């Protein structure tokens, strides 16, 4: 690769790349892919600025031949390729003369025509992924980002590509040539894959024998043994040294390491605003099932047959009416959609043979509810270059929402036991090794604790719905297919039971990419009156569709039955993960196993049996405003499972960000509790990173409020 770079790139570029790598302490003999990447990036920056000038009238012009006259000024200032001190000097002088805002990171170019700094990216991956990484790092509206890929794709801020078509084509052609040259030498694959570096963690192992001798031989000068060197590293006082290094980087960096004390952290600031609303793909605690026991009807197991059989168990249907409208939707359309489902189910029943699947008639109400013909038409860019006001959509900032009590109630319900079993105990073969015996014993204990848990019902419901929807999306792309929402369980007496929660109607689903969206309308039965917590049901139109007789302590009472209707959407990748929800069982089992392992290592014997059978012992299950909550091992299993299930049901970028950033603060607090005297710099920045994820997501807001309870008790 090094030979290729020296042949392929201009010697001046190679020399600059060597300097850059030296400045960062990297060895170009080892980091050959990085060497190639730096040269490529430098060349793209130079090509970007080549031939572009500004004339006396302040217009941008292109001059390719001969010497430009003295009155022309270069349009771009090249910052990339200078050493850091010089680069910051150039940036500071540009900011002073033009009034531009000083960037946090060194940009690559400055554009005197558009008066903005430019960050150039060259990626071997998807342009949009790299663009987002750059944007997240820079976090500045002012710096313009322009990404090129080796496949000829590009992406720029607000689709503003700065340069003319021909100049950009020159860059793309050059990148394509580099790629082909690398490929012909067998270097491309390694170069392409090297863009994402994986972090490695070195454990502190005891080193003996030959490795020990090698370690002693490879110490820095002035250290006699590995122990000496380790003692020096462990006792190293970082403040002055790190500050010195950082001050060479940027004039604004200040990293005095502050001690982190009990009084240091503050609670997370949760947003104010209207209460957050339900956003799961199906109802959770509010769902109502129409069930048949010991199903043995003809076509048992075919969803549509099962659904019709379940529907026949209920006799309290009545003329539906809207009791809680959807603020922004056309509510009569939701009402008509339900009436259409009832009518078309009735039509099926009148047929001699019930079909296996049902495609709904494409009525105006369903077209509206499924967003048919609502997507803007895609037009080829070349066909509309001359349109004056062509621009990307403006997207509004999401509205801040406050934490509402319903999400804690949802979580509590998910931890409870139902009176049915939702998973079977695996029929496991004979154990061969002792370790298998322990593993299957743990699995059986765990399964018996969670098989009746409501979170397990949500798993099976989620797996069923996502599988059915993904199948229908591939098999009937153009059809509005009716998909019953079904689950299966066993009663206390071991009898099989089939449950119907409601229906989904799928919209058009030509899903080429993982993230392409399929719209669907969900219609779900419930006994919950939406008027009790209207804010929870903001995205729903709720109909009253019947009266149900409920057995209660005072005999039979009649309760209104509701139908929760909403338009929703999902994608191939979300459905794929939804189908994998059983993994939540595995994740929570592994967490329980690590607790058992910790106990076992203290007692020096396997504690599985005692762990599950000692009913008097309690274990911590979480924090609440009252303090650390403790409970039985069964409740611990169910709580861990519910957390894992909610992470899946309420998966979102806000949750990803909150989990990653709050974990850093959690580790610092735990280090303080373990008397490890942690130090931090830019704690304010960490709080900012955590709090920018607290927007409107109910599960993230609940986790943040739990985190605050943890902070209070951990530091009191």
UniProtKB/Swiss-Prot annotation:
Cofactors, names only? Mn(2+)
Q: Where does Mn(2+) 2 bind?
A: 80, 108
Q: What is its EC number?
A: 3.1.-.-
Q: Give the primary localization class.
A: host cell
Supply the alphabetized keyword list. Cap snatching, Endonuclease, Eukaryotic host gene expression shutoff by virus, Eukaryotic host transcription shutoff by virus, Host cytoplasm, Host gene expression shutoff by virus, Host nucleus, Host-virus interaction, Hydrolase, Inhibition of host RNA polymerase II by virus, Manganese, Metal-binding, Nuclease, Phosphoprotein
**Superkingdom of the source?**
Viruses
UniProt keyword Plastid, yes or no = no
Protein name as it appears in the record: Polymerase acidic protein
Please report the organism this UniProt entry assigns to the protein: Influenza A virus (strain A/X-31 H3N2)
């Amino acid at each position: 690769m090094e030979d290729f770079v020296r042949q392929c790139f201009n010697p001046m570029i190679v020399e600059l790349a060597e300097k850059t790598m030296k400045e960062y302490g990297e060895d170009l003999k080892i980091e050959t892919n990085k060497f190639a990447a730096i040269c490529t990036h430098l060349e793209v920056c130079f090509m970007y600025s080549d031939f572009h000038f500004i004339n006396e009238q302040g217009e941008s012009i292109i001059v390719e031949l001969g010497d430009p006259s003295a009155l022309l000024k270069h349009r771009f200032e090249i910052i990339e390729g200078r050493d850091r001190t010089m680069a910051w000097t150039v940036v500071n002088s540009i900011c002073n003369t033009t009034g531009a805002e000083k960037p946090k990171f060194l940009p690559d170019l400055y554009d005197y025509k558009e008066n903005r700094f430019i960050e150039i990216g060259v990626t071997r991956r998807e342009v949009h992924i790299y663009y987002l990484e750059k944007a997240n790092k820079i976090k500045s509206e002012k710096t313009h980002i322009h990404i090129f890929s080796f496949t000829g794709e590009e992406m720029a801020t607000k689709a503003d590509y700065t340069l003319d078509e021909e100049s950009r084509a020159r860059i793309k052609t050059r990148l394509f040539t580099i790629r082909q040259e690398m490929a012909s030498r067998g270097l491309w694959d390694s170069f392409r894959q090297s863009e994402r570096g994986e972090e490695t963690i070195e454990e502190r192992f005891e080193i003996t024998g030959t490795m020990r001798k090698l370690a002693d031989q490879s110490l820095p000068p002035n250290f006699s043994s590995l122990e000496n060197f380790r003692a020096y590293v462990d006792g190293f006082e970082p403040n002055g040294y790190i500050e010195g290094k950082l001050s060479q980087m940027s004039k604004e960096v200040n990293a005095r390491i502050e001690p982190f004390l009990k009084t240091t952290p503050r609670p997370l600031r949760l947003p104010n605003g209207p209460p957050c609303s339900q956003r799961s793909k199906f109802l959770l605690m509010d769902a109502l099932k129409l069930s048949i026991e010991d199903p043995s009807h003809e076509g048992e197991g075919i969803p549509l047959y099962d659904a019709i059989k379940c529907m026949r168990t209920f006799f309290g249907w009545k003329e539906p009416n809207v009791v809680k409208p959807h603020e922004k939707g056309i509510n009569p359309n939701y009402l008509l959609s339900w009436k259409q489902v009832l009518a078309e189910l009735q039509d099926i029943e009148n047929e001699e043979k019930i079909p296996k699947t049902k495609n709904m008639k494409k009525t105006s109400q369903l077209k509206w509810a499924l967003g048919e013909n609502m997507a803007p038409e895609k037009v080829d860019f070349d066909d509309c270059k001359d349109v004056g006001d062509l621009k990307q959509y403006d997207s509004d900032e999401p509205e801040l929402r406050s934490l509402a009590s319903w999400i804690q109630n949802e979580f509590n319900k998910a931890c409870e036991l139902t009176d049915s079993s939702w998973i079977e105990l695996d029929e496991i073969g004979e154990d061969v090794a002792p370790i298998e015996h322990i593993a299957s014993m743990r699995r059986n204990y765990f399964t018996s604790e969670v098989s009746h848990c409501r979170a397990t019902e949500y798993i099976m419901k989620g797996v069923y719905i996502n599988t059915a929807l993904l199948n229908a999306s591939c098999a009937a792309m153009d059809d509005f297919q009716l998909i019953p929402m079904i689950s299966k369980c066993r009663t206390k007496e071991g009898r099989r039971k089939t449950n119907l929660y409601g229906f989904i109607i799928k919209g058009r689903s030509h899903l080429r990419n993982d993230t392409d969206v399929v719209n669907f309308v969900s219609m779900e039965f419930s006994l919950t009156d939406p008027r009790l917590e209207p804010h929870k049901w903001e995205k729903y139109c709720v109909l009253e569709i019947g009266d149900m007789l409920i057995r209660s302590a005072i005999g039979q009472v009649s309760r209104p039955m509701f139908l929760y209707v909403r338009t929703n959407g999902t994608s191939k990748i979300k459905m794929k993960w939804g189908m994998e929800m059983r993994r939540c069982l595995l994740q929570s089992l592994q967490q329980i196993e690590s607790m058992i392992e910790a106990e076992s290592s203290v007692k020096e014997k396997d504690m599985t049996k005692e762990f599950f059978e000692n009913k008097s012992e309690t274990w911590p299950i979480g924090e609440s405003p009252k303090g650390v909550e403790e409970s039985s091992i069964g409740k611990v299993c169910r709580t861990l499972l519910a957390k894992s299930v909610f992470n899946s049901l309420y998966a979102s970028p806000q949750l990803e960000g909150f989990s990653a950033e709050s974990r850093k603060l959690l580790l610092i607090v735990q280090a303080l509790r373990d008397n490890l005297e942690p130090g931090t710099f830019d704690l304010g920045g960490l709080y900012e990173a955590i709090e920018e994820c607290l927007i409107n997501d109910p599960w993230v807001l609940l986790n943040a409020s739990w985190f605050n309870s943890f902070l209070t008790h951990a530091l009191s």
